[in-house]
Amino acid sequence: MTAKTFLLQASASRPRSNHFKNEHNNIPLAPVPIAPNTNHHNNSSLEFENDGSKKKKKSSLVVRTSKHWVLPPRPRPGRRSSSHNTLPANNTNNILNVGPNSRNSSNNNNNNNIISNRKQASKEKRKIPRHIQTIDEKLINDSNYLAFLKFDDLENEKFHSSASSISSPSYSSPSFSSYRNRKKSEFMDDESCTDVETIAAHNSLLTKNHHIDSSSNVHAPPTKKSKLNDFDLLSLSSTSSSATPVPQLTKDLNMNLNFHKIPHKASFPDSPADFSPADSVSLIRNHSLPTNLQVKDKIEDLNEIKFFNDFEKLEFFNKYAKVNTNNDVNENNDLWNSYLQSMDDTTGKNSGNYQQVDNDDNMSLLNLPILEETVSSGQDDKVEPDEEDIWNYLPSSSSQQEDSSRALKKNTNSEKANIQAKNDETYLFLQDQDESADSHHHDELGSEITLADNKFSYLPPTLEELMEEQDCNNGRSFKNFMFSNDTGIDGSAGTDDDYTKVLKSKKISTSKSNANLYDLNDNNNDATATNELDQSSFIDDLDEDVDFLKVQVF
């Protein structure tokens, strides 16, 4: 019997143990109670007393085991949790207790609930939404702004009452005032709406220095029965700046704004004789006019009017004084006569400047004659040395030309005298500096400024130029050494600088050693190799000398 058959018999007689099968048999299929059994005599039902009543405790919960873990069922959507239905812990004892104080405890609980509800309501009131807060802040700002405008209107009324001799009573059309009040009530909280009264308050500050006739022509206020003509519509539109105007106003304005295409008076049938389309456009585009349209028959005295400057005076006469040219008051008026003289003078001088007129933008402000200030011709030439002014140190155009011509002459003379210093910029700078020091017309600061302005001013060389110049010198010296005679002594040895002297001394010392090496190696085949070695060693020595000179020079 072989060993193989013995092993087969032994394996057949050995009992097989299925580990997984045994474990499967050990898993309990019946439910197993985790808590102690209620039927056992040791774990009988427990009794306890609570206000004289006895209750039995329920049996413990039995959990069924399973192979797979399963999640509990999901609650239905919209189902409230049990925490909302539970009563507070303080109220449970009151419900269970039965006695004479039960009514008092219930009353106290009701009072506590009312107080808690009030506290919650007060907290909810404190939490105001953000948009309501912004609306409140906006209303506060608007009220403050309206209070400021009211104060400004009171100040303007006081000023108008003090200047009643110049100003005249104003009027406002009923249709426009009702439209203005309606818009003010509708868009009070709108920031984009610009109120007409705000423009009135702003423009009254601009025109406090002279209260004059705001309309370019004299016309009577419109009555309730008569309709507004084109001129009244234009004058009213100059004061209104609302985003959504009346449709009738916009219709008439669109008809009248096309005056430059048909420039005749048929488009303005009800306008006065002296009215021009340019004045209507200036009324529309100029927002510096007061909103309350003041109407006057004539200006009593032009000398009483005060202007801020000459330009404002010319603007006033060009716009508003055209109507009163035929009055007797203006014939003996000095202000009017001076204005006419200034107009004649400026039109004579500037007749060629105003030949081309823009028809698309025919505003009267563009064609106003501007008085030019007379400047003395000798102001630039006369320079007082006592006055400490920066303009006194700057050279004029004539002196600058003289300095440039003088520098040009000096450059030509220096080229003839010294040929070697022809391209030397430092020599030219020093020569210009010496001659500028001797001049009596300019001081040191003036000489530096003139040198900076001249064509021949000194500019220091850049680093790249210095490096290129140095590389050229090194290449030239090495080339002269390699292709010169053995002695290497030229006739111009007296004019050499330190750099060339060092190179020549190095060349003389190495040339003698090279001659000996050439004599020894004439008959050998390795003469070229020794010559190359000697040249490489010489180049290394030359580089060391150049580095030494760089340190000494720079």
UniProtKB/Swiss-Prot annotation:
Record's compositionally biased regions (Low complexity): 101-118
Q: Where is this region: Disordered?
A: 1-127, 393-422
Instruction: List where this protein forms a coiled coil.
Output: none
Specify where the region named Activation domain 1 lies, as residue ranges: 124-300
Subcellular location field: Nucleus
Q: Which gene encodes it?
A: HAP4
Q: Name one GO cellular component term.
A: CCAAT-binding factor complex
List, as start-end ranges, the regions of compositional bias called Polar residues. 36-47, 84-100, 410-421
State the name under which the record lists this protein.
Transcriptional activator HAP4
Residue ranges of the region described as Activation domain 2: 359-476
Q: Give the induction note.
A: Its expression is glucose-repressible.
- Asked if Nucleus is a keyword of the record, the answer is yes
| Broad class of where this protein is predominantly found | nucleus
* Function field: Acts a component of the CCAT-binding factor, which is a transcriptional activator and binds to the upstream activation site (UAS2) of the CYC1 gene and other genes involved in mitochondrial electron transport and activates their expression. Recognizes the sequence 5'-CCAAT-3'. HAP4 encodes a regulatory subunit of the DNA-bound complex and seems to provide the principal transcriptional activation domains. Does not bind DNA directly, but augments the binding of HAP2 and HAP3.
- Spans annotated as Probably encodes all the information necessary to anchor HAP4 to HAP2/3: 1-327
Carries keyword Nucleus?
yes
- Any one GO BP annotation for this protein: regulation of DNA-templated transcription
Quote any Pfam family the record assigns. Answer: Hap4_Hap_bind
Quaternary structure, per UniProt, is: Component of the CCAT-binding factor (CBF or HAP complex II), which consists of one copy each of HAP2, HAP3, HAP4 and HAP5. The assembly of the HAP2-HAP3-HAP5 heteromer (HAP complex I) occurs in a one-step pathway and its binding to DNA is a prerequisite for the association of HAP4.
One GO molecular function term of this record is: transcription coactivator activity
* InterPro entries (alphabetical): Hap4_TF_heteromerisation (IPR018287)
User: Which domain of life does the protein's organism represent?
Assistant: Eukaryota
- What UniProt keywords are attached to this protein's entry? Activator, DNA-binding, Nucleus, Transcription, Transcription regulation
